[in-house]
């Protein structure tokens, strides 16, 4: 069922954005069950803050002073369950770039040296849990020029990596995505032939979150994706499809994670007429091979 994980493409707050400051590159097919994308760009003077929404992903981020030839900041940002803004570090008179790997929430553990427990909404040095990967990336990041070259190198490192694979964790992701986050915790555990308590421990260690939180974030993202793609036409359809108790319940959950009224977002999406088919998130040439 790895195809379910490969097909799962969570979206950011600006899914159609592709500029010099922010661009995304898909990984090769072999990594798509674990890696959402490589992303980065050049921060221009007066760059505005970036809006952040829960995308059910974790990021390994490097900010690079291209002028001085040094990494000025590196961090691992765990899965987030809040919306907000992020600011890029800027140095007057210097060119600053960003390079990052965006892991699926259920894929980061495969490249980590330690458990991801406690990383929800976390911000820490890559050395804490990704020491081996961090050292391999730092070895060549500075000598490579541009996002495409850095993404290609990072991809080669990840492909050669001795991953920590756990079939039960991967099956848990398949079940979660198959139900779009709507299954109860007991139903989820039953499909895995384990207890709810075992599921709680499993996800805490490998995903850094509880089953309840994982379900809520996937349900929000699946709903958000459908609105962006234009496959949901109104709030009433969304309530039924995603098993919300009523419209008020859906509105509360959407506002909690998106910071916006869902009815207004439906209207804005329809007025913009922006669908995934018309505005693909990734230019075709930016899919890695």
List the predicted regions and their residue ranges.
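Alpha-helical bundle regulatory/interaction domains
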Residues: 1-173, 177-180, 184-186, 192-196, ...
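Long, low-complexity intrinsically disordered regions
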Residues: 186-189, 200-205, 212-215
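Residue-level "edge-of-site" marker
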Residues: 202, 217, 252, 268
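A secondary-structure capping/hinge motif
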Residues: 205-209, 253-263
């Amino acid at each position: 069922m790895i195809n379910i994980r490969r097909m799962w493409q969570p979206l950011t707050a600006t899914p159609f954005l592709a500029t010099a400051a922010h661009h995304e590159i898909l990984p090769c097919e072999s990594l798509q069950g674990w890696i959402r994308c490589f992303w980065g760009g050049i921060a221009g003077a007066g760059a505005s803050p970036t809006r952040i929404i829960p995308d059910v992903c974790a990021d390994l981020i490097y900010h690079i002073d291209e002028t001085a030839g040094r990494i000025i900041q590196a961090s691992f940002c765990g899965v987030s369950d809040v919306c907000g803004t992020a600011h890029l570090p800027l140095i007057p008179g210097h060119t600053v770039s960003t390079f990052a790997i965006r892991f699926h929430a259920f894929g980061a553990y495969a490249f980590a040296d330690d458990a991801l427990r406690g990383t929800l909404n976390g911000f820490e040095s890559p050395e804490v849990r990704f020491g081996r990967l961090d050292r391999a990336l730092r070895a060549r990041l500075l000598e490579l020029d541009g996002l495409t070259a850095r993404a290609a190198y990072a991809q080669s490192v990840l492909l050669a990596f001795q991953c920590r694979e756990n079939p039960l964790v991967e099956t848990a992701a398949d079940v979660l995505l198959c139900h779009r986050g709507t299954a109860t915790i007991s139903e989820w555990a039953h499909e895995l032939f384990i207890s709810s308590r075992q599921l709680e421990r499993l996800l805490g260690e490998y995903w850094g979150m509880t089953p309840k939180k994982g379900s809520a974030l996937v349900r929000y993202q699946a709903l958000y994706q459908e609105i962006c793609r234009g496959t949901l036409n109104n709030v009433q359809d969304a309530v039924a499809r995603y098993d919300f108790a009523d419209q008020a319940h859906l509105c509360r959950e959407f506002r909690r994670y998106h910071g916006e009224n869902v009815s207004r977002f439906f209207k804005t999406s329809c007025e913009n007429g922006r669908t995934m088919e018309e505005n693909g998130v990734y230019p075709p040439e930016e899919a890695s091979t």
